[in-house]
Amino acid sequence: GCHALGCKHHVAPTKSLLVEDNFDMGPSIARSDSFDVVHYDLMLDMTDYWGQTMQGLATIDFTVLQGGGTTMWWDLESLVVDSVHWNGEAVTFSQLESQLHVDAPAPMQAGEQVVLEVWYGGEPGSDPYWGGMYFASDLIYNLGIGLTTIPPNFGRVWYPCFDNFVERATYTYRLRTADGRRAHNQGHLIEEVSLGGDTLLSTWELDHPIPTHLS
């Protein structure tokens, strides 16, 4: 998707990909057999335009489909996780390259409903040619596909997610902006309130389930 605080498309050179560059999406897609991600609630502080950083709280509602597991992994690239809560309980986690591994407080049960809260922040990533999050031309905007990145899904550069073409979820976006920038986003605007000075908080709801690269 192309949204957030404005939208511009850049014409960029293409890059030929070799056969050996192909990436096996099987393990990523297989997660959707074990977990059903229902909803993402994303609280994003996008007020640091000049520092080109963001702070986020992702609240993720999901259902366990296959019990017995004690850990699960999410896609998250470039950004650093501060803490994770599982149904309100702080849990251990680790980050390895573009994966966030979260330890469940107890073996998971089939049918269990979980609210996962992830606090994170840093400088969001982008593709060398086209895609990802940009701070440019007095805008902050996101392009959901990395043109030369394998795999190409780019939800993971701005929030923890199941970043594949199979999993679909609904979304709530809560975007904090400043310096005259106003959010333009997926879904419909619920409210926009002033937090003092030139800082705004806008809330958007998207009730139609979509994959991460469109979010």
Identify the function of each model-found stretch.
Residues 1-215:
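Acidic/His-enriched low-complexity segments
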